[in-house]
Amino acid sequence: MLKKLALATALLAGVGTAHAYQAELNVGYENTDIDNVGDLDTFFINGKYYLNTVQVKNSPLAEAAFLNKASNIGLGYANASGDGDEDIDVFGVSGEFYIPNTQFYVSGTINQVDFAGDDNTGYALEVGYLPVTGLLLAVGAANESVDPVQVANYGFTANLSNALTVGDDTALSLRAKYVTQIGNHFTNFEGLTYIGDETTYRLAADLYIDPTLSVGLSIADSTADGSDTLFGIKAQKFFTPTIAAGVNYHTTDGIDSFGINGTFRF
C-alpha cells in the first residue's frame, strides 16, 4: 500500500513539473507599409537558454521565466529589407542574471547592425532591483543599441526609432515591469524610456484572459521635433504549454505594420 502511495505521489509530482522548460525559440515576420516609400519586410529569430529549468506554475505562461527569476543567455538575428537593394541585418548576444539569494538583477546586450557596407556596434547594460514579487525596477545605459530581441518584442520601427532619436551619445535607460493579479486575471505593466539627445518612452499593458491567452496595448513617442505617437495592439495564445502564436499591429502617421510570431519551448 505504501509503495502504491509513493508511486502515485511521484506521478502527481511529475504532472506538476511536466510543463517545465529550459530553452525558448521565437520566430516571426513583420510587414511595415510606409506611405510614399514602400514596404519593409522584417524577419527575426532569437533564442534563450535558461541556466535552470523554468517551472510553469499557476501564472501566465508568457511570464513564467520572469516570475521564476530565470537567468538566461540568448542569441538573436533580424533582417529588414525594403524596395531598395540594401538589407539591414542585426545580430545580438544578450544575458539576464538574477543574483542568487538577493533581489538584484543585471542584464546586458551587445549587437551589430550591418547596412550598406557599414557595421555599427551597439550595447545596452542594466542593473535592477525587485522590491516585491513580480516587480522589476532597472536603470542602465545604452549606445546605438538595436536589440534583435526587442525587435521581436516591440517591432522593428519602434526599436530603430529609439536608436536614431537618442543619437550617438550614450543614453540613460529607465525600465519597470510589474506582473500582478487584479481580481481573477493577471496583468503585466511595462514602461521604458531612453534619455539622450532626445527622450523616448514606451508604455504597455497586457491582460491575461487566462494563463494561455493575452491581449495588450502599447504607446510610444519621443521629444524629437515632428515625432508622432506610435500605437500598438497585440495578442498571444499558447495552444500547448510549449507552443504559442501571436499577432501584433502598430500604427503612426504614415506608417502601419502587421506582424505574426511563434514561440517554441523545450
Label the predicted regions.
Residues 1-24, 36-39, 55-59, 67-70:
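Cleavable N-terminal export/targeting peptides
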Residues 23-25, 54-57, 101-106, 133-139, ...:
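Repeated loop/turn-to-beta-strand initiation elements of outer-membrane beta-barrel proteins
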Residues 25-27, 45-47, 93-95, 125-127, ...:
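Membrane-embedded beta-strands of outer-membrane beta-barrel proteins
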Residues 31, 49, 97-99, 129-131, ...:
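Residue-level signature of outer-membrane beta-barrel architecture
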Residues 31-42, 78-91, 111-123, 143-147, ...:
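Solvent-exposed loop/turn segments connecting transmembrane beta-strands
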Residues 40-62, 66-68, 93, 97-98, ...:
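Glycine- and aromatic-enriched membrane insertion/assembly motifs of diderm outer-membrane
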Residues 40-54, 174, 237, 255-266:
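Outer-membrane beta-barrel "beta-signal"
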Residues 146-167:
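Solvent-exposed loop segments that connect transmembrane elements
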